């Protein structure tokens, strides 16, 4: 499953008071998603980018039933949850932003749907909720 392999950039969390978790897409890397920060208004943020095992968060398309993407999907959601929990020890969740691109956007949306709280924001570049239908239990 996914290991806690994290790249960081930007300002130290104790100084910034706000963090952006950046989740890459299938076939990409944490380093690559961090590179788009130069196009975003994130001066003064702590940037955190987890790396997916084998550059993919889950094996199949996001339109498959979630069970088809297990156990990888649950592992990815747990990793994002662990990052949010660690950040929340230092900063308020309303200062935690989560951004994803493609497969990372799907994971971002799935995480915030399953863990609904007052985050600073959720940014999804080209993604949707995971599954062949809306799973209201999530």
How should these model regions be labeled?
Residues 18-19, 95-97, 121:
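Structural motif
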Residues 51, 99, 123-126:
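Alpha/beta-hydrolase-fold catalytic nucleophile elbow
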Residues 35, 110-114:
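Active-site signature of alpha/beta-hydrolase-fold catalytic machinery across serine-
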Residues 11-12, 129-138:
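The feature captures the conserved acid-bearing segment of alpha/beta-hydrolase catalytic domains
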Residues 117-130:
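A conserved short beta-strand
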Residues 99-104, 108:
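Gly/Ala-rich beta-loop-alpha elbow adjacent to hydrolase catalytic centers
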Residues 2-91:
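Serine-hydrolase catalytic machinery in alpha/beta-hydrolase-like enzymes
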């Amino acid at each position: 499953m996914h290991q806690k392999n994290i790249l960081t950039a930007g300002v130290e969390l104790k100084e910034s008071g706000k963090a952006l978790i950046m989740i890459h897409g299938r076939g990409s890397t944490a380093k690559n998603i961090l590179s788009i920060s130069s196009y975003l208004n994130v001066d003064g943020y702590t940037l955190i980018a987890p790396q997916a095992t084998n550059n993919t968060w889950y094996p199949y398309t996001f339109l498959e039933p979630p069970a088809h993407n297990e156990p990888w999907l649950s592992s990815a959601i747990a990793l994002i949850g662990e990052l949010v929990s660690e950040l929340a020890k230092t900063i308020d969740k309303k200062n935690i932003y989560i951004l994803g691109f493609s497969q990372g956007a799907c994971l971002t949306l799935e995480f915030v749907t399953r863990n609904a709280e007052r985050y600073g924001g959720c940014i999804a570049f080209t993604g949707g909720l995971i599954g062949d239908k809306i799973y209201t239990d999530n």
